[in-house]
UniProtKB/Swiss-Prot annotation:
It is found in: Cytoplasm. Residues 321-332 have a biased composition (Basic and acidic residues). Pathway: tRNA modification; 5-methoxycarbonylmethyl-2-thiouridine-tRNA biosynthesis. Belongs to the TtcA family. CTU1/NCS6/ATPBD3 subfamily. One of its GO terms (biological process) is tRNA thio-modification. This is Cytoplasmic tRNA 2-thiolation protein 1. The gene is NCS6. The lineage of its organism: Eukaryota, Viridiplantae, Chlorophyta, core chlorophytes, Chlorophyceae.
Length: 357
């Protein structure tokens, strides 16, 4: 039997089945299709303007490494005119982040993109290892999600960025939609699939990989022989998001287009309640000056507990947005190793209860 030919060029041998479209394609046609789809996403959604300074959130994992490679490639190919730099957050997780940062440093040399590293220790006086030693593994992602989001913003502002690009892919967005449905968070459900978030703040975030499947990102990194760090965060197994991830994977196995269908459904959601129940307007934290929806930002609330020696968090999940209205902390972020840098638009209302140990 003759070898199967690529359905796109009809000349080269088909090397893989695209998870997203089920097309049998050769490597070069896969590279071209993947890059062109990301470019089309950028153009259709007007993600960037010529001359903008863009922080590419870089963890060293597959998503952020492919994002750095793609942004560097497309920026040169289509003359986006972007001033790119890599922005990494050192959470202080021994045996994980220290190793992944070495990968990011190699990426800096490979792509010729300058790197800025911001650490939890310098910003907050704590590493994640120190925090986990105080609170245990149950709610560590609560701290990390809040601190990481603020650290990315602060690092980007420090470097004069206009926007932050994160490696959130289609799987991540679908998981976020599912989580907000399960949590009954109507306001965030109405906007969690947005490709641009934080437009009401001084530093918007964009997701060029919003429609890119995680499996295709892995294939792209593999066939391009990109240098990335593949070990999962040592605290990730304790993250609640993992359950949603497994469900999305099951849906994809049964029907590959299910991921895109979930995203498209969220884009088409129209909720009357969303217009009645507005999200809090951004203001400035009274303590640190960072943008916050409450008088005191979530990072400062969490830091106060740590610094007072009362770090234990009692987490009680509630329906809707009752927790956030009370100034409580949403569980944001992705417990994950080599993936995107920075949390998706997810809220999990929790109640902060400081207890003496």
């Amino acid at each position: 039997m003759p070898p199967r030919l690529c359905v796109r060029c009809n000349t080269s041998r088909a090397m893989l089945n695209r998870p997203k479209t089920q097309e049998q394609v050769c490597r070069e046609c896969f590279f071209t299709a993947f890059e062109e789809e990301v470019h089309q996403t950028i153009v259709d959604n007007k993600l960037f303007k010529h001359g903008e300074r863009l922080a590419v959130a870089a963890s060293g994992g597959k998503d952020s490494t492919v994002l750095a490679h793609i942004m560097s490639t497309l920026n040169a190919r289509y003359n986006y005119g972007l001033d790119l730099f890599l922005l990494s957050i050192d959470e202080g997780i021994t045996g994980y982040r220290d190793d992944s940062l070495e990968t990011v440093k190699r990426n800096e040399q490979q792509y010729g993109i300058p790197l800025k590293v911001v650490s939890y220790k310098e910003l907050y006086g704590w590493t994640m290892d120190e925090i986990v030693s105080q609170i245990g593994t149950k709610n560590n992602c609560t701290f990390c999600g809040v601190f990481r989001r603020q650290a990315l913003d602060r690092g980007a502002v420090l470097m004069g960025a206009n926007k932050i690009a994160t490696g959130h892919n289609a799987d991540d967005v679908a998981e976020t939609v599912l989580l907000n449905i399960l949590r009954g968070d109507v306001p965030r459900l109405g906007r969690c699939a947005n490709i641009i978030t934080g437009e009401d703040s001084s530093l918007p975030r964009v997701k060029p990989f919003k429609y890119a499947y995680e499996k295709e990102i892995v294939l792209y990194a593999y066939y391009k022989k990109l240098d990335y760090f593949s070990t999962e965060c040592i605290y990730a197994p304790f993250a609640a998001r993992g359950f949603a991830r497994e469900f999305i994977k099951d849906l994809e196995a049964a029907r590959p287009l299910a991921i895109i269908d979930v995203i498209r459904s969220a884009e088409d959601f129209v909720f009357a309640a969303a217009s009645d129940e507005k999200l809090p307007q951004p203001r400035t934290c009274e303590r640190c000056g960072y943008i916050s929806s409450q008088p005191v930002c979530k990072a400062c609330v969490l830091l106060e507990g740590l610094n007072r020696g009362m770090p234990r968090l009692g987490v009680s999940r509630t329906r809707g947005r009752r927790g956030e209205k009370a100034g409580l902390h949403p569980d944001v972020g992705r417990g994950g190793g080599g993936g995107s840098s920075g949390p998706a638009e997810v809220a999990s209302p929790v109640e902060i209860v400081y207890e003496t140990t």
